[in-house]
Every structure is written in structure tokens, then in C-alpha cells.
């Protein structure tokens, strides 16, 4: 077996999209065959399965279709063997957010195939999907539009083909399947291949099935063909050939067009028993060499020896037809441990995918040595980043962190969590599903949609709360263990949900299809190998093109071996700690982190580490750890001293070493790309690939530069031990150290851009910030704004999407997925654009370019990230020799300070609190003062006025180029800063800039000459007055009353001074600090009357409902002075304003306003009651108030002058009676508002007609009677009482169609249709009506003495509303009680039996009328002996005979109409009989009366 030479990692895996992308699957049910479905179900059992393909846990594959190419990826998951998932991937779009999941009724075999064809006349591509069931049913799905399907739908039958292949298999088993457009090939256990054309079958055409076999007839009986092991289809000159691998090692090639065999050759392993051919793969035909690469997997079944892939060359020639020949095996590829997942060919390589490794081998037709290149899978990258690998372990991080911090375990715990969180949520490491499952292990339950909706801040808070809850030991070692376990669990879930399944090949692009993601691979350049490799790789540095000799390359290799030793000593801890210290929480100064790390490297870990971990590790274990650390330190120190001494001896001097190192440092500087970027814009998917690849590349460069940084710092610490001269030390300290610091800062900033997730921003709040900072927001970012705040969306995406064509030139063809070369070029262009902009101009310094990129981020609300970037840039500038010069001339440093101040202010505005808020405010103030102090600062800020948040003032001295006053510039800038702090409610900062602006006023106006139009003295006075007014406002906001008063008396503008004084007094009253006015603390002289004036001014211009209320304060003030009338006047004005403003303002609780009005009127009446009756009056509410020179007062005056032109009536004085009347109206309005009835008192002296009706409607009967009795007399009073009781009676009537009954009260007509009220049930309505009857009874008895006819009005109203209603007994009794002596008939008062009888007749209540008449006639006839004498007097008896006659005619009329004939006939007979008896009795009584009179 030939030798294979394996090199270290040749490339990296790049995810196509961030881990936050989760595909939403659209489920589509695929119907089963309609014919003999029961038999298919029966034959689908294991015993009757005719398709027996090799089993696998999960099946996945892919194909590239069309031009431009579209990749289709499909998968059959072991958890859902009856579902096939299809994903479409295109270089012109983003990562697909939806995919198709076809759910079949049967289990699927591990096979599927997709191809495209033109869809007839439409010209659109139509996709066909092949699938196969173990029972032998082929499904062909026609997909016309992959975006048109809806979840839960059923696949249309007219686009579905079922083909049952069992009748054509001759009872053999299917052992292999392959497909090409229009064909499906089934390799059988009898050695034959069945070829089917499902489309032809669907068209009912013949010839849809063919068999590929060696011969026919009797000759075949003597030939035994082994079972088909594998099938593969290859295309040569437009013709498809089927390669068939048999179990005995025979290889047969068939021409699909002619169904003829063109090659038959054995490739079985010779002289080796038990070795069988398992799989077959072919590459694309190479027409230059006439060879098709062919690979066969050999496996020995008897023992556990490794599998081998042998690569053959299948030669073809097309002189006369196509002739094929197979050469002997050229190359052997041994497969070590790990399951082989896939094998693919590219133009010059063969790729093998195993569960934990991707390897490529160059195809060499002449050499027997195959160079193997291994590519780093994402699992290895994630484990290294999470400190779970041997190169980067959490133990190194633990020891280094304990040694780095001198104390404060809280700092250590927070620092540790911050490092792990940053790594965990970094794009390329973060995976949505894996993290959700990890948190599920910790009892954090979220659904997929809920978890996807979490922002970065919310996710961070949840994890930190989990740490706080679960880490109970409260020690740093416990936090380390928790994070190690958490990351281990996360890595496990990541690997379980992202197992490699198959390779995706598109031209020379190699992709990897995982369970839940897709990724590409790009090769590392030779330089990157040398930078990021081990010490053995540093021997080949000629590819770096440093411009040095071969011997110098060897010296450089020794230097890099020294950096490798330092890196090995540390592990991955220093990179993470340095990055977190610079970009994270400011726990350690950026100037201290590297010296501390070097001290640890030189003297070892802190001796207190054993004490810090005593309780966790125990004394013995801690001591062992300390001894081990000391031993490793001694070994490392000796090895480094020997290596550095040998390095110096080899070079001849340290100067030579430093010169070579300087060349190397020049190479580490980010390269400029001078290509003209005029290509098309990057798509979303290419942008994602670019950002992921850039992050991995920049990480290598950053770590390489940081290794040199540590080496140089280490050399400075041990300079005496390696015989370094003072000149060498100076060169190292003053030249190389600043240079490497700049390089590290540049790579760190780029790394920060590509790995830091963008923070979420509320667009509503952000628009306000944009308008306040005057930052341009014209960029259309609606398409990607939703990604802000997600873990997979870094700051680099914002930079890319703001200018998508910034890094693309004409060399790139972005119609396809980017190849490794294109990815590398894009990465280089992107880095160059970030560092040097589009032009790559040398004048684009780090400071200038950082501010340009910061502006792009500020436009998108990334103030936190910008602030950290500017901190890094500022720290880098502190180490430059030209720092002072750049600060004084270019203005870039001033712009940096200005932007950082804006970011700090934004952080304060967004919720910083406590000490952190105070620190950020102080830093922001310091930044703005620094920004104004540099030379040329006004030019830099003035040019970016619309974007950087600075807008030049429109008043005061102007700033013109060539005649610029430093004081004028600072005055403008300080005023702007004052306004910004004021806008953010940061009074302490605004006050400082107001004081600073005051210091510049005199100098700013000194250089301006006086003209007729402009007086600089007056302008300066006005400016000082305005600034002192601002100082007054800010000190008042800060509750610095003494300083506020000093600002008042210092103000030179008398008008502004008076306004401030007014404000000062008002604030004192509002804050409850009025004692300062009278305790002599402040020298107020003659302000007794001004207090009243100012408070009254405040009362007239403030919200009437404010608390404390100025009117009430005035009332109390005048009451204490015994000025009763003024006190009453203030309270009446208070009530009047409430009345006038309450109607036009939408108060939330109008009842509170009315209550305040009642209190005001009551207080006014009480005050006037203390005055002599002859003087108990107040003036009307004044229409004019004292005029003050303010805008509001001037507007009020203008409105007042306009209203004066209209005629006005004279207003009389207001006495107690008028107050009482208004009190009654206001009480009515208040009570109506409590019942949600709208009525407003408009100042009338008499109540309107609708007021009483509203009160009755609202059940406010007492108030209604109060109004009536207050404002009406005589007959008008009786009319209003009747109206009230009529309305009350109507409310007692049940609604039409409501079934209701109450004993002894009333009965409704039962011949109406019964319908329930929509707002209450019959029982509730009945209860309410019963209450209405009781209320009516109470009030009727109360007011019947005032108006005796009220019962008649009530009864008439009830009968008019419902003629069938039964009057309540108590109401009938009121009519009967009106007749005190029944012997006298039905006569009586207004509410008499006769009036009740008349009502019965009027409303058709014939039965009740007859019964009532009969009752009184019987009573008349059965008089007691004592009453007979009274009855026999003249005119002693009266009955309403006219009404009786009407009753008689009504009965006859009813009978004639045919209604109630029997009942009316019976009533008529009773009436007739009673009348006869009554008349007889009357005749006898009359005769007796006549006899008595004549006798």
C-alpha cells in the first residue's frame, strides 16, 4: 500500500449562516397509491420488503441544478423515517428560512433524487423529486414552484406519479439505487439492473422498463452474476453511463442510451481473502487527459482492519464511438478510525468525509504518494473557543485569571462569565437549537419560537441569572466548573444536532451538509499556515515574501518557535483575557493587562492561588497544583533562555534579530487591496459566508500578532538575562513595541467588528435619538433591521449592508457559491476596506478610519460598540510617538472624543444607573471638553455637523475659516453640549458647560466691531443673561437653591431676572419649601405682595387640577388674613375655571373635577357666611388679568382684544343665593357623571328641560325632586312632579317580549313573542322592575300630599304603556282610599274609584272595569243599617253613569267583533243584572227620600 503524507489543517469550515437561523419546515402530505393500497400496506412489512438498501442513521444528499446553479439538499431523519426534508440553496439569496417536508404514508428507503426540466410552454424550470419505499413503490413529485406550498396541505395528485416496481423484479431484492433525469435504476440481488422511466410510465407509453444484463437465452444459465453492490452514473460527451459494482468485484459500465454494455472488468482485491468492494464513486470526465477518476471502497469483513479507498483511472476515447478502459489502481487511501460518510471528486482532488474529519487528496496519475490535507471541522473550532480542547483548556484560564486579579472574587466571577458568554454567543459558535437544549437541561423551558424571539440582551440576562441561581458556593472555582459543565453540555448538543452527513460539491466549491446547517470550506494560505501552525510548520516561511534571505527565514522560524512555546505555556487564555479586558467590562486598564501577563509568565502563577481555591480543592491538592506550576515554570524559563540565547548567537546580534522581526511585523499589518471595487452587490448568503470566514482569519492574525506582542514584552523583562545592550532595549521599547501594539489594536478592532453581535434598537426610540443628535437616517435598513440584537448578526453585517458592493470587484462571479479562492479574496478585500476604506489611501489612519466606521454604526444605534472601539483606538494612540502631533493638527482626535462622548450619553440615556451612570456622565463631560481643546477641532466637527451630532449655532458670533476665534468656537460648542445634556436630563453636565460658555462670552465678542445693525455689548449681555438663566434652571433641577438664587442675582438682563424670580418662587411652592421665603435665609425684601401676585399668575396659567393647587393656597392665605371676601372670590374663580375648562379638556375622571367644583363652591359659601349680610357678595370672575411680558400672556391679550370687539352684557354681583343655585346644579351634574350621564351646567339660572328627565333616567330621584322643589312653584311644580312620576312609571313597565311575573304586583301579556334582553336575564330584569315598583310606591306616598292627582298620572302612564298590565295593589288601594265612605258610591278626591274605573274603560280593561263597578255596587247595596240613612239623602249617591254606558257599548262592540264573545257576554249579563238591582235600589231610595222630604 502506497505511502500517504498528511499535512496539518489546510482550511477551515465556514457556516453558510449564523447559528440563529432556524429553518421553518412546511409540511406537505403525500397521498398513497390509490390502487391496492391495502396490499401495499401489507407488503410493507419487514419480511416483504423488496428494497434492502444499506441502513444508516440519517440519510442526506445533495445535487447542483441549473444555470446559475441552485443546490438542493435533502434529508431523511432517523426519527421520522417517513418524512423527506428538501432545502433549496442559492448564491443569489440568503440562507433559506423555509424548507419543504414531504410526509409519506410509508417508511422511505435511504434514497432521493432531484433534477430539473423545462416546464413546457412556460419556460420555467420544473423540479422532479424521486423517492422510494422499502415495499417497492417509486414516488415522483413534480414541483413547479417550491415557494407556493402551504403547511398542512396535501400534495396534488395531478403532480404525483406512483410506480410499483415489484412486478418487474423477478422476486429479487433491490440492493442499490441510482437515478438520472428521467430514469431510476434499481440494482438487484440477481446481478441485473432494472431501468425505469416513470414519466413514460405515467404517459401510458410502452418501453418504460428495461433490464440491463450480460446476455439472454440459454447462454446465461452457465453464468453466475453476483449481486449489485453499488451504482453510479457518469456523463461523457453528453451521454450517460451507468457504472455497476457487483459484490464479486466485477465492474460493468452500461450505455444508458442503447442499454448496451461497454465495459466489464474485475477490480476485486487479489490475493486477499475476505476483502469485498462496498461503494463506488466517480468524478467528472477530464477531456484533456481522457480520464474519469473512479474510487472504490474496500472492506475486510473478517477483522477490524481499516477500510481502504482505491482510486482508479477510467480511460475513455471517442475516435469511433466511446471506448472505455480501466487502469490498475493508482492510489490507495487508508481510512483510519471513523465512519465514512461521503466521498466526492473535484477537478483535481478526492474528498473523504468522516464523522470527525474532512480530508482531501490530490489526484496524481503518475505519483504513488498522495498528499493528504485535513480541514478543521467546526466541532474542533468550537471546542477550542470554549476552552474544551487540549490546546485551550479551562484550567489555564482558571490559573491565569486568579493570578491576574489581585483580589475581589466578584471581579473574577464576573470576568469569567463575561469571557464565556462572549465566546458562547459569538457568531460561528452560537447555535440556536443547541443552546436551547442546553438551557433545557437546566430547567429553562422555551418553545422554538419563544427562544428565537429572545434578543441578545435577554438571552444574556437569562444565562447570568442561571449562573447566579445554580452556583451556590460563591467562589470563582465554582463558577469555572459551572461554565465548563455548561459548555461541555452545549458542545454535546451542538454535535448531536449538527452531525456531518454529506458533501456538497458545486464546481470547485466544497460544502458540508449537517443535520441542521450547511457550511463551506476555504483553504488557508501558506502564510496563515505559518502564522497559526505549530513549531514544525515554521520552517517553510518563504511564501511570506518578506524580502529577506533564506538564512533570515530560518532565524524568523526560530523566533516563531519561541512564540509557540509561549503560546503552549499559556494555552488560549491570554487571547481571551486580553480581548475581554480591552472590549469588555473595564476591570483592568488596557495598559496593565500585558505587563501583568508577562509578569505571570516570568514569575509564575500567584502564590495565593492555593488560598483562593483552598475550600474547593483542599490543601493537599492545591499544594500539588502549585508544585506542578513551579516545575513547569522552571522548565519553560530555562527552555526560553536557551532558545533566545541560541537565536542571538545564530543571528550574530540582537539588532539583526530585531530587523528580521520588523520585517515580519510589516507582514502582520493588514494588507491594502487596490482592486477597483465595481462589482455587483453581495447577497445575504455570501455576506454571511464572508463574515464567518473573516472572523476565523482575523482570529489567526490577532493571535499571531499577540504572540509577538507577548514575546517582545517578555524580552524587555528578561533583557539582562539574554545579554541585551541598552541600545537594543531602546530599539525594542521605542520601535518594535509601539509597532506591535498598533498591529494588535488594528486586528483587535477588526475582530471586534466581525465577532460582536449588534445590539437591538427600538426604531421609535432610535428615531428620536437620530433627530436629537441630527444623525442622518436615510439608509434603508428595513430588510435587516429585525436581525439587530440577534446572536448571529455581528457588527460587520451592518458595515457590509451599508455598502454591499464595497469589497466586490469584477473578478468575482457571485452567481455561484464562492470558492475557496473567492472567499480568500473577499476576506482580504473586506479587511482592507475596514482598515483603509475603498481607496486604500495611506493617509487613512487608524484614527480617521475608526471614526468613519463609527459613524456608520452610530446611524444604526450601536453606541455601546462604538464606545468600546474608540476606547481601543484611544489606547492605541497613547503609545504612538506622533500622538501629540496628530492630536494638534488633523482634528481626528477631537472627533474621536466627540463621538465617544455621544456614545456615553446614549448609554446613560438607555438605562445606565448608579455608580456606572455617574462614571459615564463624568467621562462624557471630559470627552466633550477634550474635543473642544484640540487644534482644528472645529473643522473636523463642522464638516460632520449633520452626522456627528454637532450643529453650529445660528446666533452670536459666527465661525468663518480664516477669521476664527477660539473663544467663539468654544462658546458655540459648549452651548451645543449644554443643550445635549439638557435634552437627556443630565443637569450636572449641562450646568458645567453653561459655566464654561459664560467664561468664553467676553472673549468671543471682543473681536467683533460695533455697527449700526449689531451692538456686541448688547449681544454679550443678552448671551450672558440667557446662559445665567440656564445655570438657574440646571441648579434648580439639581435642588441647589443657593446656587439658583446666585444665578438670579448674577443675571444682567432684568427681564430674564424677573422671569427667573417668578419661576423660583413657584418652584418653592411646588416643592413645599416655602419656609425659605420667610425664615430670612434669602434676602427677599418687599416680596409680600409679590408672593400673592406671582401665585395668582401661576394659578391662572397652570393646570386647574395641579397639586398643590394655587387657588387653594390663596384661599388659605386670605383666610389666615381674615379677608373673607377675597378668599371666597379665589375659590369661586377656582370653581369657575373648573366649569369652563372641564368641558374642553378630556379629564380621565370627570367626577373628580366636579367634586372639586363642589368643594370650591362650598368653601366660597362658607367664607361669605362669615361676612355681614349686607356685604356678602363677590365680584364676577374677572376677564382681564395682570399682564406679563411672556408669549402665553401676549397670546391671551390678543385673544382678549378680539373678544372685546363683540357686545357683552353686564354681569351682576354674586351672592350666596346664586352660589347655592350653582351648587345645586353642580351637585346634579356630579351625580349624573357618577352614573355616566353627560350633562354640563352652562351658567343658566333656571334648569333646562332635560335635566330632570336625565336625573330620573339615572335613578337620581332625590336630586330630581330637589331641583324641582328648588326652582318651581304652583302649577308648574305640579306639572314637573307629574312628568317625574310618569317617567318613573314607564321604567316600571317591562320591556316588550320579556316574560316576567311577580306575585301581587303585575302580569304581562302572555300572547306576545318572548325574547330575552341582550344585556340582562329575565330574572335580573324582574328583580330590577320589582325595585322600581318599590321606589315608585315610596316616592308616590311621599309627594301625594303636594299633588293629589299623582296616582292618576301614574296609572294612566302604566296603562298607556301596556294596556294589559295589572296595576299593583298598593296603587289601586290609593284610588280606593280616596273614597272614605263607600256607601256614597264611587265619588271621592282626584284619585278616586271613579277615576280608576274611567281609566279601565279608556284602556279596554273591561273585565277589571266591570269587576270594580260590581264591587262598588254590591258595597252600595249591602250597606250597613247605620249607612242606609246617609244613602237615602238627596244626592247622597254618585256613580259615573256615563262611563258605565261607555262600558256597556264597549262590551257590545267587542262581542260584535267576534273576540272574547263568551267572556263579554258573561260580563254583560253580570253588569245587566247589577244595574237592574242598582236601579231598583235607587228607585226605592229615591221614593224614600221624596217621602221624607214631603212628609
Swiss-Prot record:
Protein localization: Nucleus membrane; Nucleus, Nuclear pore complex
SUPFAM superfamilies recorded for this chain? Answer: WD40 repeat-like
Q: In which tissues is it expressed?
A: Expressed in roots, stems, anthers, siliques and vascular tissues of cotyledons, leaves and hypocotyls.
**TM stretches of this protein:** none
Quick one: a GO cellular component term? nuclear pore
Answer yes or no on keyword Nucleus: yes
Q: One biological-process term from Gene Ontology?
A: regulation of timing of transition from vegetative to reproductive phase
Alphabetically list the UniProt keywords.
Membrane, mRNA transport, Nuclear pore complex, Nucleus, Plant defense, Protein transport, Stress response, Translocation, Transport
Question: What is any Pfam family matched here?
Answer: TPR_Nup160_C
Name the major location: nucleus
Q: Which domain of life is it from?
A: Eukaryota
The way this protein sits in the membrane is described as: Peripheral membrane protein
The entry summarizes the disruption phenotype as follows: Pleiotropic phenotype with diverse growth defects and early flowering. Enhanced ethylene response and sensitivity to cold stress. Reduced EDS1 expression and enhanced susceptibility to virulent Pseudomonas bacteria and oomycete pathogens. Accumulation of nuclear poly(A)+ RNA and high-molecular weight SUMO conjugates.
Under the heading InterPro entries, the entry gives:
Nucleoporin_Nup160, NUP160_hel_plant, TPR_NUP160_C, TPR_NUP160_M, WD40_repeat_dom_sf
Stated role: Contributes to the transfer of mature mRNA from the nucleus to the cytosol. Required for both R gene-mediated and basal disease resistance. RNA export seems to play a critical role in stress responses and regulation of plant growth and development. Required for proper expression of factors associated with auxin signaling.
Share what the entry says about its subunit structure, partners included: Part of the nuclear pore complex (NPC). The NPC has an eight-fold symmetrical structure comprising a central transport channel and two rings, the cytoplasmic and nuclear rings, to which eight filaments are attached. The cytoplasmic filaments have loose ends, while the nuclear filaments are joined in a distal ring, forming a nuclear basket. NPCs are highly dynamic in configuration and composition, and can be devided in 3 subcomplexes, the NUP62 subcomplex, the NUP107-160 subcomplex and the NUP93 subcomplex, containing approximately 30 different nucleoporin proteins.
Q: What is this protein called?
A: Nuclear pore complex protein NUP160
